[in-house]
Amino acid sequence: MLQVKHELSDAKYRTTVREEDFVHENQGTQNSDTIIQSNEFSRSRIKALLENGISPSALNKFLACPLDFYYRYVIGLGEMEELEESMEAATLGIVVHQVLEKLFEPFEGSVIGSDDIKKFLPQIETQLDLAIQEKYTKDNELSGFDLITKGVARRMIENVFKFEIERLEGKQVKIEGVEESLEASLPMNKVGRTELVKLKGLADRIDSENGHFHIIDFKTGKVEPKQVTFQESDEKWLTDRNGKLIQLLSYTYMWHKKGVDPEKISATLFGLKQSKQGYVPLHRGKNEARVTEADMERFEKELLDVIVKMLEISEFAHHPEAKYCEFCTQ
């Protein structure tokens, strides 16, 4: 709050700072007792979802809270999208991702190095303004907290490029894809027949260097190495607590299914608030061993187990340890 007060006191923002005490009263009620029975409609919707392609996000939602999964993916409420009057912090990532996409996209299929990334820096402000205008009302001049949010977005983007400039000093990588669609089909054995279900995803960027592939996903939230570390001794990898791990295992699996040795794939997360940390890779054990063919086989088996649970679920109820979504607090 002190930072906000200091920033807004600047005369150029034309903003008056007024301090008030505020007590928040939560008007929403948590409908934790809501239970929805599975029926022919829900089963057909889940089957269609699996045929068209289920994303790591949907898998994570099912594991974290079946009721939330029902609302978002079975009856299709999804995320509410609208043209916003102000820059909400929750959608900061959308703007940052869009700017990164626009600047890297022209180099898709090309080899780039440190000098190429340096040319991105003068373009940040223009691309950031365009992204904000597209996401928010065009006739609303940014002021106050929105200007601070824009500044945060700018610094996040600058930090990505500064990190890449240093990382690529003296070498080059090929941009294999930007906002790259990934998918893989899995055979699921049912009584007397085999059906295919599809896993799909969208990687922010994929690079390659000397036959090795680097899958990148940018995160506005906090990223910790333990969130993408797995052990052979773990009882299960696909659990409600392993959202980021499931995402990177899924990306690795889908790229592996293109015929790439998993040991030549490094799926990573980049915390935009922790740019000095750099890329945080998916790895096995404390020694940061690479993912193996055996790991992919185990992932596929666990994935099919989750899919079977989706198809056979009898009721959709709130997970007691999950946060309440907006659908449960109305």
Regions found by a protein language model. Give the residues of each.
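RecB-family 4Fe-4S metal-dependent nuclease core
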Residues: 1-330
